[in-house]
From Swiss-Prot:
The keyword Coiled coil does not apply. One of its GO terms (cellular component) is plasma membrane. The lineage of its organism: Bacteria, Pseudomonadati, Pseudomonadota, Gammaproteobacteria, Pasteurellales. Residues 1-23 are cytoplasmic. May mediate protein transfer from the SecYEG translocon to the periplasmic chaperone network via its periplasmic C-terminal region. SUPFAM superfamilies: TPR-like. This is Ancillary SecYEG translocon subunit.
């Protein structure tokens, strides 16, 4: 169960966006930090933290000399040190991807559950929730998979959410509900998603 092309593109776009814009993100409560000096201090501090996390993430992910056990330990340390940041979520998504490629869905579920608690971004949360729901579906956790999809927000995810919902409903034996879900995907999806939904409708 590989990541879809759309998910890969969205994750890579988010990574690039954070590298370019993360250090200039303005948080509303910072307006009360204490005048211009406080703002400048906070902005400099945040920029340094984000730049450091970005560099550490690149080093961690691109390391080819470490064995898997050592790399896993380093990723756990990185996530703990960079808790609640996008880079912690990216690291956990990478781990979940490797686990699914090995069909170790239990490990993938653990990584994605952790990523979901770390994410502070709606788009990133939606991507993680889609992946987690798909993994729970693979594990036969059908009710959990449907529940997880409630955390997927935004119109751009509607078709993928509807297709996965339909797959789960088919597995639960509810073909009427599945038909409605696949038809919804046909109305809101890209050309590829529409074709996928049509194929699933034909197979009902």
């Amino acid at each position: 169960m590989a990541y879809s092309i759309e998910e890969e593109q969205e994750i890579n776009q988010l990574k690039d966006w954070w590298k370019e814009n993360g250090k200039t993100i303005i948080v509303a409560f910072i307006l009360g930090v204490g005048g211009m000096f406080g703002w400048r201090y906070w902005q400099t501090h945040q920029a340094e933290q984000i730049a450091q996390a970005s560099a550490q993430y690149d080093t961690l992910i691109n390391s080819v000399q470490q064995d898997e056990q050592a790399k896993k330990a380093n990723i756990e340390q990185f996530v703990q040190a960079n808790s609640k940041t996008a880079y912690a979520v990216f690291a956990l998504l990478d781990e979940a991807k490797k686990a699914t490629e090995k069909q170790d869905f239990s490990a993938a579920e653990a990584n994605l559950n952790q990523a979901l608690t770390q994410s502070q971004d709606e788009v990133l949360t939606s991507i993680v929730a889609l992946r987690l729901s798909a993994v729970q579906f693979q594990l036969g956790q059908l009710d959990n998979a449907l529940s997880t999809l409630n955390q997927v927000k935004g119109e751009s995810f509607n078709a993928r959410k509807a297709i996965l919902t339909g797959d789960i409903q088919v597995a639960k034996g509810d073909k009427v509900a599945a038909k409605n879900s696949f038809e919804q995907a046909q109305q809101s999806g890209s050309q590829l998603e529409q074709q996928m939904a049509k194929m699933k409708l034909n197979n009902l």
